[in-house]
Amino acid sequence: NVKILEKIYDFTKEKIDFKFHTCIKSVEVKDSNSFVVKTDSGEEYSCGNLVLATGRSGSKWIGSVCDKLGIAQKSNRVDIGVRVELAAEIFKHITDDVYESKIVYKTDKYNDMVRTFCMNPYGEVVAENTNGIVTVNGHSYSQESLRTENTNFALLVSNKFTEPFKDSNEYGESIAR
């Protein structure tokens, strides 16, 4: 919700320096209590606390920063699935009461948990391009004039990896390719 994000930003903007759309060249430990961040445009920033928010598309880069700084990493789960679109009327009895409903099914054979995610009543399926890999996502609109006659949601199965194969992002990308 944009209003919530605006409130978070307004609350923190006097306490935190935000740098958006900034390409970082390196992150170094200055001493035990501070960092130096260098950008590709030659700027340098020093700080005691550092939050790097790269998102999934920057996971390889942030992994290399962690390796360089000796920060332990943990393999995350990866969600593999499809986006389902159907007539909104089919789920209306659910989405009119619970906008973002979660439906979970446990398979008999492997005990996998299959779940819905990101339900979009009266929404649309859209293409997304992340690092040259095209995937799909869904949107819905509060403005009635933009609504469609369809509802869409992701149907996902989660996988968690351990040694020796632990790169869940690479696995997800290989499936998407």
Predicted regions and their residues:
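Residues forming the flavin
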Residues: N1-R177
